[in-house]
């Protein structure tokens, strides 16, 4: 589905019956969360709240509440079609020598297509039609959601954070939640391993005492948002990949107060800086963030993160505020992960051809548990795959549990997976434990914040050398009997 910006996408979703306008008054304080959560769990449409309590700005929620809408946002009709983008990313991440002239020409065509999708910079843009500066900068003027009763403050959730490290040509796009701290201040909760935090760390080391520019785009088009959460190779701009998804170049405009480039058709853009603060060990202003309800289904603990001071807010005329909540799966991040799972399969298969399928069940908080199907070739093969997944992509750095099964097990069917675990696993022999590894800061089960253990389960059939016993043979019915019974079955009317 081709579209230019979020508004165009909304119009097309409504035409497809994938968006519902909510004309009743609904409060950003808790009520939007409750209504979006109920709608998502029912497989319902995106919701456009046209009358948010206390505000004139409509709120868009549940945009990515189904895998189909994620697929539509990436320019295809079905989630199964996303593997084509996975093959593109695999070619770019780990390029191999072409196996022939035809493949060489195909790779050249891919590079040419990506080059043609380089972002286009505009001199002026809709996102700067209205400008708030000075005392006009007040986040209370925006319908920012307060998602859960125990949340300490309203929370910006779908903000596309734009940063750039010193001496880097490429800007980084990331989605990090932001706690509203004051009328013009938010807390930027980016984890140390994320791109925005790394850019900021480099700036702080090379330019101590100098403010660090940041922009946050709210209501960017879906392709740009999804490009920011996709494992794009470091050599490729997320803006460029968004153009590939959208089928047209991403249009950008220079921010008014820095050299950063922002999406030209974003609904709202927050421009500002992280300012120096000699009282903090980092040399920059920090504040205690949280607690907030998170995708784990719990409130997370508090921690210190940088304070982003907003110098100006630019926006389109009659802007739309794009928001979400996170909670016990399923939520929007879980639906995103379920769809993006299809991108990961070709990426992993390029590095590990023995992987025949890969699944991140949403019940596992989107990334904490992975089930891997392999074509086993030798003893210890499952363990090689476990270590490979943990180290190959940054997205799997925080995966706590990996279950590896043979290619006769349907990894998207829990009944089949549990059968494999209970019949093919000896807890002592087939459990791999790794201690003191990077763990999600939000994982309160780990003994130390950000550092914990991982577990791998080898639920494959065991080969000689892995067991001294005769291994069981799965029960199967003969093909001729199955065919005969099928004929009888058709006569029973069952």
UniProtKB/Swiss-Prot annotation:
Main subcellular location: membrane
GO MF term (any one): 3-octaprenyl-4-hydroxybenzoate carboxy-lyase activity
Catalytic residues (positions): 294 (proton donor)
Pfam families: UbiD, UbiD_C, UbiD_N
UniProt EC number: 4.1.1.98
Binding of prenylated FMN, residues: 175-177, 189-191, 194-195
Subunit structure: Homohexamer.
Protein name: 3-octaprenyl-4-hydroxybenzoate carboxy-lyase
Organism ancestry: Bacteria, Pseudomonadati, Pseudomonadota, Betaproteobacteria, Burkholderiales
